[in-house]
Amino acid sequence: MHPGWLSNAYLAWEEGTREGFFVDSGAPLEPLVELVEHEGLTVTALLTTHTHGDHVAGDSELERRFGVRGTQSASWAQAIPTPGHADDHVAFLVDDICFSGDLLFKDAVGGGPDAEVIRASVLKLMELPNDTRVLPGHTDETTIGRERTENPFLRYWFGGEALDEPCRVAGEEATLVVWSPDYDGKGKALVRMTDGHESIVGGSRVER
Protein backbone atom coordinates (compact mmCIF):
# COMPACT_ATOMS: atom_id res chain seq x y z
CA MET A 1 0.00 0.00 0.00
CA HIS A 2 1.23 3.49 -0.83
CA PRO A 3 1.89 5.35 2.45
CA GLY A 4 0.38 8.61 1.20
CA TRP A 5 -2.31 7.59 -1.25
CA LEU A 6 -3.20 4.42 0.68
CA SER A 7 -3.57 2.80 -2.74
CA ASN A 8 -3.09 -0.89 -3.46
CA ALA A 9 -1.34 -2.79 -6.23
CA TYR A 10 -1.91 -6.51 -6.56
CA LEU A 11 0.01 -9.48 -7.93
CA ALA A 12 -1.77 -12.77 -8.56
CA TRP A 13 -0.80 -15.92 -10.41
CA GLU A 14 -1.94 -19.35 -11.52
CA GLU A 15 -0.12 -22.09 -9.66
CA GLY A 16 0.02 -24.53 -12.55
CA THR A 17 1.39 -22.25 -15.26
CA ARG A 18 3.25 -19.85 -12.93
CA GLU A 19 1.85 -17.03 -15.05
CA GLY A 20 1.04 -13.90 -13.08
CA PHE A 21 -0.54 -10.51 -13.52
CA PHE A 22 -0.60 -7.17 -11.77
CA VAL A 23 -3.68 -5.11 -11.00
CA ASP A 24 -2.95 -1.37 -10.83
CA SER A 25 0.47 0.02 -10.00
CA GLY A 26 0.02 2.85 -7.52
CA ALA A 27 1.61 1.13 -4.51
CA PRO A 28 5.31 0.43 -3.88
CA LEU A 29 6.15 -2.27 -6.42
CA GLU A 30 9.48 -3.62 -5.20
CA PRO A 31 7.96 -6.18 -2.78
CA LEU A 32 5.78 -7.50 -5.61
CA VAL A 33 8.69 -7.56 -8.06
CA GLU A 34 10.71 -9.54 -5.51
CA LEU A 35 7.80 -11.96 -5.20
CA VAL A 36 7.76 -12.45 -8.98
CA GLU A 37 11.43 -13.40 -8.83
CA HIS A 38 11.09 -15.58 -5.72
CA GLU A 39 8.15 -17.54 -7.15
CA GLY A 40 9.65 -17.81 -10.64
CA LEU A 41 6.63 -16.19 -12.27
CA THR A 42 6.13 -15.03 -15.82
CA VAL A 43 4.22 -11.74 -15.81
CA THR A 44 1.71 -11.67 -18.66
CA ALA A 45 -0.50 -8.64 -17.96
CA LEU A 46 -1.11 -5.42 -16.07
CA LEU A 47 -4.82 -4.81 -15.51
CA THR A 48 -5.81 -1.19 -14.93
CA THR A 49 -9.06 -0.44 -13.12
CA HIS A 50 -8.90 3.25 -14.12
CA THR A 51 -6.26 5.75 -15.14
CA HIS A 52 -6.14 8.06 -12.12
CA GLY A 53 -2.56 8.80 -11.11
CA ASP A 54 -2.64 6.85 -7.87
CA HIS A 55 -3.42 3.68 -9.84
CA VAL A 56 -1.04 3.97 -12.79
CA ALA A 57 2.01 5.59 -11.16
CA GLY A 58 4.16 2.48 -11.63
CA ASP A 59 3.03 1.52 -15.13
CA SER A 60 6.27 2.60 -16.79
CA GLU A 61 8.33 0.61 -14.28
CA LEU A 62 6.32 -2.55 -14.91
CA GLU A 63 6.62 -2.07 -18.66
CA ARG A 64 10.37 -1.66 -18.32
CA ARG A 65 10.79 -4.72 -16.11
CA PHE A 66 8.25 -7.11 -17.64
CA GLY A 67 7.18 -5.67 -20.99
CA VAL A 68 3.52 -5.30 -19.98
CA ARG A 69 1.29 -2.29 -20.57
CA GLY A 70 -1.89 -1.38 -18.75
CA THR A 71 -4.98 -3.00 -20.26
CA GLN A 72 -8.63 -3.51 -19.43
CA SER A 73 -8.94 -6.72 -21.42
CA ALA A 74 -7.74 -10.26 -20.70
CA SER A 75 -9.27 -13.56 -21.78
CA TRP A 76 -9.20 -14.95 -18.23
CA ALA A 77 -10.64 -11.86 -16.50
CA GLN A 78 -14.20 -10.57 -16.71
CA ALA A 79 -14.07 -6.80 -17.11
CA ILE A 80 -17.20 -5.18 -15.63
CA PRO A 81 -17.78 -1.59 -16.82
CA THR A 82 -18.32 0.46 -13.67
CA PRO A 83 -18.26 4.20 -14.48
CA GLY A 84 -18.95 6.86 -11.88
CA HIS A 85 -15.71 7.48 -10.05
CA ALA A 86 -13.99 7.65 -13.44
CA ASP A 87 -15.42 7.37 -16.94
CA ASP A 88 -12.98 4.57 -17.81
CA HIS A 89 -13.47 2.61 -14.59
CA VAL A 90 -13.83 -1.17 -14.71
CA ALA A 91 -13.85 -3.86 -12.04
CA PHE A 92 -12.22 -7.21 -12.79
CA LEU A 93 -13.58 -10.59 -11.76
CA VAL A 94 -10.99 -13.37 -11.72
CA ASP A 95 -12.36 -16.64 -10.36
CA ASP A 96 -13.92 -15.70 -7.00
CA ILE A 97 -12.01 -12.43 -6.56
CA CYS A 98 -13.28 -9.00 -7.58
CA PHE A 99 -10.70 -6.26 -8.04
CA SER A 100 -13.04 -3.33 -7.44
CA GLY A 101 -10.69 -0.40 -7.96
CA ASP A 102 -12.20 2.79 -6.56
CA LEU A 103 -15.81 1.70 -6.92
CA LEU A 104 -16.39 -0.36 -3.77
CA PHE A 105 -14.46 -0.20 -0.52
CA LYS A 106 -14.94 -1.67 2.91
CA ASP A 107 -17.77 0.49 4.36
CA ALA A 108 -17.76 3.03 1.51
CA VAL A 109 -17.94 3.61 -2.23
CA GLY A 110 -15.97 5.79 -4.59
CA GLY A 111 -16.76 9.45 -5.00
CA GLY A 112 -18.16 11.04 -8.12
CA PRO A 113 -20.39 13.82 -9.43
CA ASP A 114 -23.43 11.62 -10.14
CA ALA A 115 -24.55 9.32 -7.34
CA GLU A 116 -27.00 7.50 -9.62
CA VAL A 117 -24.23 6.41 -11.99
CA ILE A 118 -22.17 5.12 -9.06
CA ARG A 119 -25.19 3.34 -7.59
CA ALA A 120 -25.84 1.54 -10.88
CA SER A 121 -22.20 0.44 -11.05
CA VAL A 122 -22.10 -0.77 -7.44
CA LEU A 123 -25.31 -2.75 -7.93
CA LYS A 124 -23.63 -4.64 -10.77
CA LEU A 125 -21.17 -6.00 -8.21
CA MET A 126 -24.01 -6.89 -5.85
CA GLU A 127 -25.04 -9.53 -8.42
CA LEU A 128 -21.91 -11.49 -7.47
CA PRO A 129 -22.07 -14.23 -4.80
CA ASN A 130 -21.83 -13.06 -1.20
CA ASP A 131 -18.56 -14.92 -0.62
CA THR A 132 -16.79 -13.13 -3.49
CA ARG A 133 -13.63 -11.52 -2.15
CA VAL A 134 -13.35 -7.81 -2.92
CA LEU A 135 -9.84 -6.38 -3.28
CA PRO A 136 -10.30 -2.61 -3.53
CA GLY A 137 -8.05 0.13 -4.82
CA HIS A 138 -7.44 1.44 -1.30
CA THR A 139 -6.86 -0.25 2.08
CA ASP A 140 -8.68 -3.31 3.38
CA GLU A 141 -10.24 -6.20 1.50
CA THR A 142 -13.84 -7.20 2.13
CA THR A 143 -16.56 -9.40 0.63
CA ILE A 144 -19.69 -8.75 -1.39
CA GLY A 145 -21.83 -10.18 1.40
CA ARG A 146 -20.31 -7.96 4.07
CA GLU A 147 -20.79 -4.82 2.04
CA ARG A 148 -24.35 -5.77 1.16
CA THR A 149 -25.29 -5.68 4.85
CA GLU A 150 -22.76 -3.35 6.50
CA ASN A 151 -21.93 -0.65 3.95
CA PRO A 152 -24.04 2.48 4.70
CA PHE A 153 -24.44 3.27 0.99
CA LEU A 154 -25.68 -0.23 0.19
CA ARG A 155 -28.05 -0.20 3.14
CA TYR A 156 -29.58 3.04 1.84
CA TRP A 157 -29.76 1.84 -1.77
CA PHE A 158 -31.47 -1.36 -0.61
CA GLY A 159 -34.21 0.62 1.14
CA GLY A 160 -32.69 1.85 4.39
CA GLU A 161 -33.48 5.23 5.90
CA ALA A 162 -31.70 8.38 4.78
CA LEU A 163 -30.08 10.71 7.31
CA ASP A 164 -31.83 13.76 5.79
CA GLU A 165 -29.57 16.08 7.76
CA PRO A 166 -29.04 19.71 6.67
CA CYS A 167 -25.46 20.43 5.68
CA ARG A 168 -23.34 22.56 3.40
CA VAL A 169 -21.11 21.35 0.57
CA ALA A 170 -18.46 23.77 -0.64
CA GLY A 171 -20.51 26.55 0.93
CA GLU A 172 -23.81 25.57 -0.70
CA GLU A 173 -26.88 24.34 1.17
CA ALA A 174 -27.49 20.62 0.81
CA THR A 175 -28.96 17.57 2.53
CA LEU A 176 -26.75 14.82 3.90
CA VAL A 177 -28.33 11.53 2.82
CA VAL A 178 -25.63 8.96 3.70
CA TRP A 179 -22.45 9.20 5.74
CA SER A 180 -19.82 6.49 6.03
CA PRO A 181 -16.27 6.05 7.22
CA ASP A 182 -13.70 6.14 4.43
CA TYR A 183 -10.21 4.79 3.91
CA ASP A 184 -8.61 8.23 4.38
CA GLY A 185 -10.24 8.79 7.77
CA LYS A 186 -12.26 11.79 6.54
CA GLY A 187 -15.53 10.06 5.71
CA LYS A 188 -17.62 9.80 2.55
CA ALA A 189 -21.03 11.35 1.96
CA LEU A 190 -23.96 11.11 -0.40
CA VAL A 191 -25.40 14.61 -0.60
CA ARG A 192 -28.47 16.07 -2.29
CA MET A 193 -28.19 19.63 -3.52
CA THR A 194 -31.12 22.06 -3.52
CA ASP A 195 -31.83 21.27 -7.21
CA GLY A 196 -32.28 17.59 -6.32
CA HIS A 197 -29.00 16.39 -7.84
CA GLU A 198 -27.14 13.81 -5.74
CA SER A 199 -23.39 13.26 -5.69
CA ILE A 200 -20.87 11.38 -3.56
CA VAL A 201 -18.14 13.52 -2.05
CA GLY A 202 -15.31 13.30 0.42
CA GLY A 203 -16.27 14.06 3.99
CA SER A 204 -13.87 17.00 4.17
CA ARG A 205 -16.16 18.90 1.76
CA VAL A 206 -19.20 18.55 4.03
CA GLU A 207 -20.04 21.00 6.82
CA ARG A 208 -22.41 19.33 9.27
Question: What are the language-model segments listed below?
Answer:
Residues 46-56, 80-89, 134-142:
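Histidine-centered catalytic micro-motifs
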Residues 1-39, 91-101:
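Conserved beta-strand hairpin/beta-sheet module of binuclear metal-dependent hydrolase folds
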